[in-house]
């Protein structure tokens, strides 16, 4: 049975008199820094020279230092820059300045799990991973709540790494909702699998295939977009609120019957076998090795995949239709960003 911790299991006093360095001030970074600050914790933000986030952090009343200076000043260092830049940043700025008995923290275990960061033996290494985007972590906290999170300990030099990590989890509000104990390996492997097989890879491929099937059969692209992309949110919201059963309760009997008889024909035993292969590649490090190499060699395939999908018909049709629906809060991105 999973072990869950709540506010009464965590002691925020463990962070009293200590300085927490938040390295990075993006989606998660700003939420962690501001929530900790509001919880009475001494926070500094570590950013690279010329960072556009410096003005935002200072406007929020936070002290901004270089990554090296922030690390040197801190008892707890939370690394919240992208996975792809962590290893180099750790080597150049964090490792040389890390206090001998500091706590090194992450919100995702990729670089620890795959050996891109190897911490010194004398420091605690732990993880607090909110299960929500940063803006939501902040928003819910400001309304007196919290989002669920994961906690893990990779290295317990002090003998108190778990308790200290839970204090951090309480400081950002996760312990209000519940913090589930896991491991760096489990968090990393399941997170990557979810992204690849379901949340990003699986859903994107399914939506495109459905759209293409309808358009190739002669149906209007606009109607195909509504059926295969736009209405997906309506169903996912039902999943989010009450799982599969609530979704089926909420849709028509015709839709529910179609769910039962058609779903297994689309997601077949071959699909599940492919999922198992993806998981094996995550577990044995093949995916990580490929992704690390892709970043070291200029991201040629990554950029090609990105530019190809930007030109997909479903994207063109979607932009036009979303412009007619201001209530969905339409977003546009620069394809090169």
UniProtKB/Swiss-Prot annotation:
Keywords: Amino-acid biosynthesis, Branched-chain amino acid biosynthesis, Magnesium, Metal-binding, NADP, Oxidoreductase. It catalyses: (2R)-2,3-dihydroxy-3-methylbutanoate + NADP(+) = (2S)-2-acetolactate + NADPH + H(+); (2R,3R)-2,3-dihydroxy-3-methylpentanoate + NADP(+) = (S)-2-ethyl-2-hydroxy-3-oxobutanoate + NADPH + H(+). PROSITE patterns: KARI_C (PS51851), KARI_N (PS51850). Residues 2-182 form the KARI N-terminal Rossmann domain. Pfam families: KARI_C, KARI_N. Residues 183-328 form the KARI C-terminal knotted domain. One of its GO terms (biological process) is L-valine biosynthetic process. The keyword Plastid does not apply. One of its GO terms (cellular component) is cytosol. NADP(+) binds at residues 25-28, 51, 53, 83-86, 134. Binds 2 magnesium ions per subunit. Pathway: Amino-acid biosynthesis; L-isoleucine biosynthesis; L-isoleucine from 2-oxobutanoate: step 2/4; Amino-acid biosynthesis; L-valine biosynthesis; L-valine from pyruvate: step 2/4. GO terms for molecular function: ketol-acid reductoisomerase activity; magnesium ion binding; NADP binding. Mg(2+) 1 binds at residues 191, 195. Its cofactor is Mg(2+). Its EC number is 1.1.1.86. InterPro entries: 6-PGluconate_DH-like_C_sf, KARI, KARI_C, KARI_N, KARI_prok, NAD(P)-bd_dom_sf. Substrate binds at residue 252. Disulfide bonds: none annotated. Mg(2+) 2 binds at residues 191, 227, 231. Involved in the biosynthesis of branched-chain amino acids (BCAA). Catalyzes an alkyl-migration followed by a ketol-acid reduction of (S)-2-acetolactate (S2AL) to yield (R)-2,3-dihydroxy-isovalerate. In the isomerase reaction, S2AL is rearranged via a Mg-dependent methyl migration to produce 3-hydroxy-3-methyl-2-ketobutyrate (HMKB). In the reductase reaction, this 2-ketoacid undergoes a metal-dependent reduction by NADPH to yield (R)-2,3-dihydroxy-isovalerate. NCBIfam families: ilvC, PRK05479.1, PRK13403.1. Belongs to the ketol-acid reductoisomerase family. PANTHER family: KETOL-ACID REDUCTOISOMERASE, MITOCHONDRIAL. This is Ketol-acid reductoisomerase (NADP(+)). It comes from Herpetosiphon aurantiacus (strain ATCC 23779 / DSM 785 / 114-95).
């Amino acid at each position: 049975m999973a072990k869950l911790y709540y506010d009464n299991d965590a002691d925020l006093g463990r962070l009293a008199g200590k300085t927490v360095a938040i390295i990075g001030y993006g989606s998660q970074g700003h939420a962690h820094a501001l929530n900790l600050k509001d919880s009475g914790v001494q926070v500094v933000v570590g950013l690279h020279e010329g960072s556009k986030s410096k003005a935002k952090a200072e406007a929020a009343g936070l002290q901004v230092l270089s990554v090296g200076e922030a690390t040197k000043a801190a008892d707890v260092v939370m690394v919240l820059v992208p996975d792809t830049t962590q290893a180099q940043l750790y080597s150049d700025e964090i490792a040389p300045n890390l206090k001998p008995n500091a706590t090194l923290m992450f919100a995702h275990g990729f670089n620890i799990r795959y050996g891109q960061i190897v911490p010194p033996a004398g420091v605690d290494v732990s993880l607090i991973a909110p299960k929500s985007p940063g803006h939501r972590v902040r928003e819910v906290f400001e309304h007196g709540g919290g989002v669920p999170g994961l906690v893990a300990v990779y290295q317990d030099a002090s003998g108190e790494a778990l308790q200290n990590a839970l204090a951090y989890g309480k400081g950002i509000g996760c312990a209000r909702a519940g913090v589930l104990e896991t491991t760096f390996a489990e968090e990393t492997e399941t997170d990557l699998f979810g992204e690849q097989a379901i949340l990003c890879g699986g859903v994107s491929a399914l939506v495109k295939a459905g759209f293409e099937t309808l358009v190739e059969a002669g149906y209007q692209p606009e109607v195909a977009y509504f059926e295969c992309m736009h209405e997906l949110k309506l169903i996912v919201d039902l999943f989010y609120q009450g799982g599969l059963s609530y979704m089926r309760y909420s849709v028509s009997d015709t839709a529910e019957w179609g769910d039962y008889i058609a779903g297994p024909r689309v997601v077949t035993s071959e699909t599940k076998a492919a999922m198992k292969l993806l998981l094996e590649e995550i577990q044995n490090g093949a995916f990580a090795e490929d992704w690390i190499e892709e970043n070291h060699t200029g991201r040629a395939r990554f950029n090609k995949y990105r530019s190809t999908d930007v030109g997909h018909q479903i994207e063109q049709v979607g932009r036009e239709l979303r412009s007619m629906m201001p209530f969905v809060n339409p977003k546009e991105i620069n394809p090169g960003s």
